[in-house]
């Protein structure tokens, strides 16, 4: 157990590619879902930032004396790493040795998981869960999708009283899992590449849009592009960048 993935962050597409670079662990037989409870959605209006994960790491390691942590933290559009996926973590007493632990941003005893930002967080979490179960060659059912409250050693409602198992399983089964490109696909920071093509800062501001996690250039969807909140950088594949032509 360790905190070696702290500082890593992935979009759903990037996470799919990342999983292709590591070997599924034999111990993992399920995914266990949690909610952060605190912080709430209101306390993190812009989702997680890198410093938030560093603070959590410090809390787990120094204040609680843990040698590991949950594996992933999910906000509206990204997965933030902490415990390596190949190592058992610390998140639910009965499930630590058999499940990958995921913390979903929000307090779903009081906040709403079926609309707004809450729904966005759960859509991202269930897409990530589907990728993990596929990676582990596991089916989607109530034995592979665990809630913290399923642990007989806890009295918590986690991942929140408003979150139902059947609803989550349905989201997982119907999640839009990306068709992953080979790991060798090359990505570059989009803005510097547009500047090299001769676009001015003003043209880039007008032409580059990000909506619902999708990146658009002059209303054209760049399917492989994504915005990384950790570095505050938009990345696009070299292929897509090369197809961009400056309109005279």
Please place each PLM-identified region on the residue numbering.
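Disulfide-bonded cysteine-rich modules in secreted/extracellular proteins
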Residues: 181-199
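Charge-rich, solvent-exposed alpha-helical interaction surfaces
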Residues: 18, 171, 190-193, 207, ...
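Repeat-associated, polar segments at repeat-unit boundaries in modular proteins
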Residues: 172, 176-178, 229-248
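Basic/polar, cationic surfaces and motifs that engage anionic cell-wall
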Residues: 1-36, 43, 76-79, 84-88, ...
């Amino acid at each position: 157990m360790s905190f070696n993935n702290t500082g890593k962050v992935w979009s759903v597409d990037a996470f799919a590619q990342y999983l292709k670079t590591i070997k599924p662990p034999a111990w993992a037989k399920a995914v266990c879902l949690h909610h952060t409870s605190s912080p709430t959605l209101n306390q993190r209006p812009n989702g997680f930032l890198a410093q938030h994960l560093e603070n959590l790491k410090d809390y787990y390691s120094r204040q609680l004396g843990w040698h590991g942590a949950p594996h992933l933290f999910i906000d509206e559009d990204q997965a933030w790493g902490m415990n390596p996926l190949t190592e058992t973590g610390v998140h639910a007493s009965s499930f630590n040795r058999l499940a990958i632990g995921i913390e979903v941003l929000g307090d779903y005893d009081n906040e709403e998981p079926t609309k707004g930002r809450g729904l966005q967080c759960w859509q991202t979490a269930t897409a990530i869960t589907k990728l993990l179960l596929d990676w582990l060659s596991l089916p989607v059912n109530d034995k592979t999708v665990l809630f913290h409250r399923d642990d007989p050693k806890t009295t918590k409602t986690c991942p929140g009283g408003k979150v139902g198992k059947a609803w989550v399983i349905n989201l997982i089964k119907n999640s839009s899992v990306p068709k992953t490109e080979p790991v060798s696909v090359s990505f570059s920071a989009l803005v510097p590449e547009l500047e090299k093509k001769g676009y001015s800062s003003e043209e880039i501001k007008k032409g580059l849009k990000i909506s619902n996690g999708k990146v658009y250039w002059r209303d054209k969807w760049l399917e492989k592009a994504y915005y990384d909140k950790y570095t505050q950088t938009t990345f696009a594949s070299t292929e897509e960048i090369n197809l961009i032509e400056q309109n005279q």
